[in-house]
Amino acid sequence: MSGGSQVHIFWGAPVAPLKMTVSQDTASLMSVADPWKKIHLLYSQHSLYLKDEKQHKNLENYEVPESVGSPDFSGHFLANCMNRHVHVKDDFVRSVSETQNIESQNIHSSRLSDITSSNMQICGFKSTVPHLTEEEKYQKLLSENKIIDEQPKHQSDICGQNFNTNLFQLGHKCAAMLDLVCSTEQINIGPEVVQRECVSTEYHEIQNQCLGLFSSNAVDKSRSEAAVRKASDLKISTDTEFLSIITSSQVAFLAQKKDKGRSPINKGNVNMETEPKASYREIRIPEENSIQLDGFTEAYEGGQNQAYSLELFSPVCRKTENSRIHINSDKGLEEHIGSQELFNSEDKLPPNEIHIELCSSGILCSQLNTFHKSAIKRSCTSEDKVGQSEALSRVLQVAKKMKLISNGGDSAVEMDRRNVSEFKGIKKTSLIKNCDSKSQKYNCLVMVLSPCHVKEINIKFGPNSGSKVPLATVTVIDQSETKKKVFLWRTAAFWAFTVFLGDIILLTDVVIREDQWVGETVLQSTFSSQLLNLGSYSSIQPEEYSSVVSDVVLQDLLAYVSSKHSYLRDLPPRQPQRVNSIDFVELEHLQPDVLVHAVLRVVDFTILTEAVYSYRGQKQKKVMLTVEQAQDQHYVLVLWGPGAAWYPQLQRKKGYIWEFKYLFVQRNYTLENLELHTTPWSSCECLFNDDIRAITFKAKFQKSAPSFVKIPDLATHLEDKCSGVVLIQAQISELAFPITAAQKIALNAHSSLKSIFSSLPNIVYTGCAKCGLELETDENRIYKQCFSCLPFTMKKIYYRPALMTVVDGRHDVCIRVESKLIEKILLNISADCLNRVIVPSSEITYGMVVADLFHSLLAVSAEPCVLKIQSLFVLDENSYPLQQDFSLLDFYSDIVKHGADARL
C-alpha cells in the first residue's frame, strides 16, 4: 500500500489565517474550534482509498464523468478498474468513478521532471472567502481562509490546490484529478495572485466571486482599497443594465394582472409581434427587431455545455485536445443531477431567453429554448474559444405585434387580445426543509423575504475569459420555518425584478446545492426552472389558485405568514398601473418603477463610447440626454435600443420641446437620483411653437426662469452702464465672421440669398472635436493634430464665431457670439450637415436652409429678437466708459411673439 501514490488533502480550514501567514492586520481575528483534518488518499493500480489517521473509509453513492485522457504522465497505461467507494464523515461524500479503458497520454519530459521535482509546499492558494449574512446587509468583514496543501519529500505525489468537493476525477497516477486541482496559470482571487496549472478555472473563479458578491470583503491592509474594489464589483455591464430596464418596464405593464378582464393587455409577453403597416402617429418596431446580449457567455453557444448549475461549470482544458464534452438531455435532467456525469450524445441546448408573460394565475417567468436539437461535438482547440463578442444570447424578441396608437389625443398600448396563458398546475410541492436530495428537482411554494439586485460574475480565465454571468439571490421562507437563499443564474437572474417583499411565488425545477465555503445549502435555478408570482401576501385568495397549487398548502403558507410575519399585513398594497391612463408628469414629482409620459426640453447629449451593449446583433453605444422642464433643473433620459435611433433628429433640434411617451423611471443607486429610460414602446414627437402642448410648457418654463435685470431698451442699458446679465430687445443688423486678421465675411440686409449661400464654406472650419481649436493643414492638405488634446484626434466642422451688430433706434453695439450659439440661431443645424439633402428625393440641402435663415434674420423687416447678454463696463472716476464688452449667452427668436415681458 505504501508503494502507491499518495495525495495528502487538508480540509476544514479555520477562519483565521495560519501562523505562517498571519499579519498584524489579522492578529485580532478569532479562529474556529474545529482543527485541521488530515486524510491520506492512496491510489494503486486496482484500488483507491481515503485513509484517515484512525480509520479507512470508502467513497460511494457518487459518479463522475468519464476521464478525458490526461496528458500528465508518460507512457501508455490501460486501466481496467472497478468502482471503489469511500465513506468520509462530516459530509465529505463525493463520487469517484475510476475510468475504464482510458489511455494516458505522453507528456514532455520537462514537464514530468518539473512535477516530480516539486519537493515543496504549495501555499499559494489564498482565497478571499468572505461571508455576509442577510442581517448584516453585506457590511461585516471576516478574515481570509487559507487553504494549504502539502506534499511530502522524496515522492512524486502531486499536491492539490483548491480541492473541489463537488467534482473530481481519478485516472492512472491521479491524472484526471490533476486536471482539476493542479494549475499553471494565475488567478486573481481578491487581492492575492496564486499559481495554478489547469485551464479549468472558471468554476472556482465564479464560485469565489459569488462569495464576494454575497459576502463582505476580507480584511485588507487598506480599508479604502477594499471599498473601491467592492464598489467596482457591484458595477454591472451595460448589457445587464439594458436588459434590466427592459425587464423592469415589462413588469410595470404586467403588474395589472388583477384586472385580467378589463386590462388592455391580456398577454404581456416580452415577445410581441408587429403588424406590417403603421397608421398616423403610430410607432412600430420592425419584426426582426431582437435584443441580443454579448455579456452572458454561457458556454453552450460554443458547444461547451453544462447541465444546469454552476457546479457543472467545468471548462475544457486547452491541452487535452482529444477530449470532447457532450451532454445527453434525452435521458432527462433527473438522471443527471445526482451524478456529475457528462454524457456523449446529442443534446438540445439549454434555453437562454427571458420570457415574462401574464397568465391566469399571475406573472410567469420562464426561459425559452431558441436552439434546435443538434449533435454537439466540441474539440478543445483554440478555434473553440467563446469570447464575449461571440456569445450572443438572444434574450428578448422585442416588439412583435405591438404598436402605439393615438386615439383622440390619448395614447394607449393596444396588444393582442388573445386569452391569457394557462399555467399547468403543480399539485405536488415540497417544503424547503424536505429539499435534501441533490439528485432531485423540487417545486417549492414560498414567500419572498428579501429580493436583491442583479449582480455579475466576471470570468477572467479560460475559454470564456472576459465574459460575465448574471446572478441574483432571493431569500425565501415557507411554513416549515426554513429560510433559504435561491440563486438565480444567467437569464433567470432577471426574474428578481418581478418579485417583491411579501410575494408568494412558486419555483419549479430547483435543485439543492451546498455552498461549501459558507457552509449552507441553497436552492438553485436550472435551465428548466420557472417562477410564478401569485401576488403579494395580502392580496391572495387561496380559492383563486386551486388549479395551480394545492389550496391546503397555500392556506398553510398564508397562515404561517400571518402568524410569524404579521408585519407584512401592514405593507401598503402595490397599486397596478393602468396602461391606458399613464399620466404626463412633472420631473420633480417622479416616482421610481413606473411608466410615464413627459414633455421635455432637450438641453444636451452625451454618448458613452465605452458603455456598449448588444442590440439586434450589433454593438450600440449608450446615449444619454440632458432634459429639463424648469430652468436649470436637469434630468437624465437614456435612449435604449430603438430609442437610440432618435439621436440624429434630437441633435438637429436641440433646445426644442419634445413629447416623450412610455418612459420608465428607475433609480440610479450610484448617483441616488431618478432617471428616465426609453422602452420598446416609447415614442417621441417634436412640438411646433403653436402647439397647445408647447405653449403650455413654455408658460410653466418661463415662470421658473431666473429673474434678470429688466431693461426696456438698449439705450437705457447703455446709459446706466450696469455690468451683469441682462435681456435686451433689439434687431440684428449684421453678422461678421472673422477669417483672418485682415479678412472677414460680413452678412447684412444688403446681402443676397445667393451671396450668403456661396459664403457658407468660408464661415465654417475644421477643428478639434474636443476643444474646438481650428486645425491647420500641411503641404499635403492633411490636418495637423491638436497637441493639447492628444491622444484624442477626432475632427469636427464648426461655425466660426461672429460679431453680431444689434440696433435699437439710434444705438447699436457689437456682441461676440460663440460657435454653439451660431448653431442654435440656425435651428441647431450642424455645420457638417450643410451639404446633405433634407430628404433623398429632394435637392434641397441644409445649406440652403441655413442661407435662408441668415437672409430672414438680417432682413430689414425682420422681427426684433430678445438676447440674453453678459455686459461688462470699465469706468473711470467720472463714470465714463473706458471699455465695454458684450457677449451673447442665449438667443430667443420667438419670445417676442408671446411677449417678452412674460420672460422678464
UniProtKB/Swiss-Prot annotation:
Region (Interaction with ASTE1): 1-568
Gene Ontology cellular-component terms listed: nucleus; site of double-strand break
Domain of life assignment: Eukaryota
Region of interest: Mediates interaction with SHLD1: 721-891
Major subcellular site: nucleus
Assigned keywords, A-Z: Chromosome, DNA damage, DNA repair
Region (Sufficient for interaction with SHLD3 and MAD2L2): 1-60
Subcellular location: Chromosome
One Pfam family recorded for the sequence: SHLD2_OB1
InterPro entries cross-referenced by the UniProt entry: FAM35A (IPR029715), SHLD2_C (IPR031589), SHLD2_OB1 (IPR049507), SHLD2_OB2 (IPR053944)
GO BP, sorted A to Z: DNA repair; regulation of double-strand break repair via homologous recombination
Similarity comment: family membership: Belongs to the SHLD2 family.
Record function comment: Component of the shieldin complex, which plays an important role in repair of DNA double-stranded breaks (DSBs). During G1 and S phase of the cell cycle, the complex functions downstream of TP53BP1 to promote non-homologous end joining (NHEJ) and suppress DNA end resection. Mediates various NHEJ-dependent processes including immunoglobulin class-switch recombination, and fusion of unprotected telomeres.
Subunit organization: Component of the shieldin complex, consisting of SHLD1, SHLD2, SHLD3 and MAD2L2/REV7. Within the complex, SHLD2 forms a scaffold which interacts with a SHLD3-MAD2L2 subcomplex via its N-terminus, and with SHLD1 via its C-terminus. Interacts with TP53BP1. Interacts with RIF1. Interacts with ASTE1.
Protein name listed in UniProt: Shieldin complex subunit 2
